[in-house]
């Protein structure tokens, strides 16, 4: 089994759930913490907030797993494209 944990900051849980479904996953758990894709799973492990300049910034830990390394890499690439933010 191959796995990778990502820590995402600044994107709320609702958007993360939307991104997971956009890349082909369906919710498995009623509490929207476990998602199943084709030959892969994504799980929201932890949701917390960090305080910065009078704001609470969401910090979400996601665990992706697959039996195939190539599948895992493709899923993570798709997910990273969804979460990419360009600043100036």
Predicted regions and their residues:
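Conserved mixed alpha/beta catalytic, RNA-binding, or beta-rich assembly cores of soluble enzyme
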Residues: 13, 19, 85-88
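Long, highly charged amphipathic alpha-helices
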Residues: 15-22, 74, 78
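C-terminal basic regulatory modules in eukaryotic proteins
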Residues: 50-88
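Short, surface-exposed ligand-recognition loops at beta-strand->loop->(often short) alpha-helix junctions
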Residues: 6-12, 67-68
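Ser/Thr-rich, low-complexity intrinsically disordered terminal regions
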Residues: 2, 7, 17-52
């Amino acid at each position: 089994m191959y796995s990778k944990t990502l820590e995402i900051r600044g994107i709320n849980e609702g958007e993360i759930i939307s991104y997971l479904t956009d890349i082909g996953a369906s919710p498995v758990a009623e509490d929207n913490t476990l998602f199943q894709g084709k030959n892969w799973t994504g799980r929201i492990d932890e949701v917390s907030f960090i305080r910065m300049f009078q704001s609470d910034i969401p910090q979400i830990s996601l665990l992706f797993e697959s039996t195939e390394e190539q599948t895992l890499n493709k899923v993570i690439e798709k997910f990273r494209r969804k979460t990419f933010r360009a600043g100036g």
